[in-house]
Amino acid sequence: MMTMIWGTFNSFGVFFGPFIREFGWTRAITSGASALNTMIFGILCVFSAGLSERLGPRRVITVCSIILGLGYFFMARVTTTSDLYLYYGVFVAIGMSPYIPLLSLVARWFTTNRGRMNAIVLSGMGLGIMLVPPMANQLISMVQWRNSYLVIAIVTLMITVAASQFLKVPSHQALEDRDGGPDTPWADRRNEGLSFRQAVRTREFALLCWLYFSFLFCLVSITVHIVIHAIGLDIPATHAALTLSFIGGACILGMNVMGNIADRFSNKIALGVSYSLMGCSLVWVIPSHSEWSFYLFSTAFGFAYGGMQVLFSPLVAELFGTRAHGVILGTGALVGSIGAAIGPIIAGYIFDASGSYTLAFILCAVLAFTGLASSLLLQRRPLS
């Protein structure tokens, strides 16, 4: 499910060129669809977590999977910006919203080595980013962009609906880790930690929200604009699309390496390393013009992306416990979605105004380094 949800989402940058060529839209306007998507996605993450608690993840995620497939089906019929914003900005966002319930299931099933378990689940995200964008680019060259979206819709619908039927919550107790985790009843584990009201009063909650904001601002700005930026530097479209594949492949490695570092040392250390690497990679891409320099950037950026992505769920469990895990994580994602929404628009506006992405990349680098500073301020408090 992670492969299809995030692989198709990160393919939007591949369709950027066809949209601009066919309709003559500016980059800022086209980016607005991604902005609306991430805003609605962030809002719905909070509600999907609550609905999953009440109705169960299988029902909620099945319905969302159907809506996701319909969203991509309707994308093949886009003729105006209103269509683009409705189908991609609303329908696809609704279909993506079970992301938080999926991560909360992992946090509750596994009581130890959460970083490693999260890495395994989220590796599907990196796999999707690695495989789907170049496949989408190949489809566009073969059958044009409208038919490509039809293929994506059918495949996404079949895989996500089928996979959602296997989801379930632990009925009595969390899975015992191979290392020998404590055998605590599920009901007890569910009530560990701070309530949502208690959590929002802490400094750590504010830091979590800023970490999410800076992370998603940088991430979505890059995934939306990096392909069209590379093409603008005379890198062939097929090779430019590979930058997303390098991000996806390195993302898988980053998830597993940083997940293990978090389990062995702490989420704080792993998060600091990830933000440092992301900031440095964004500085590197500013003067880059060659294919190899873009691939090197994509590898470093993707590794950092994977590290951050895998750490937020166990970080919430470490800082606040699992009592309100889904709602706290969903609220952080909601704040982060603001960054994800305005990031691509700001980057597109900067390019439309100046003809260059330089200022956009500098802004992303600054935000990444502020994320590093914020991660160093995190402190674990007693869960009472």
Task: Locate the predicted segments by residue.
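Helix-loop-helix hairpin linking two adjacent transmembrane segments in secondary transporters
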Residues: 120, 125-172
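Symmetry-related core transmembrane helices of the 12-TM Major Facilitator Superfamily/SLC fold
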Residues: 149-165, 359-377
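Interfacial helix-cap and linker-helix signal at transmembrane-aqueous boundaries
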Residues: 19-20, 51-52, 134-143, 230-231, ...
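Conserved MFS/SLC helix-loop-helix module at the cytosolic interface between two early adjacent transmembrane helices
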Residues: 43-81, 262, 268
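Extracytoplasmic gate region of multi-pass secondary transporters
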Residues: 12-16, 197-255
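C-terminal transmembrane helical hairpin of 12-TM major facilitator-type secondary transporters
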Residues: 219, 239, 245-315
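Hydrophobic core of transmembrane alpha-helices in multi-pass small-molecule transporters
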Residues: 3, 71, 82-97, 213, ...
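Intracellular juxtamembrane helix-capping segments at the cytosolic ends
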Residues: 19, 97-110, 307-320
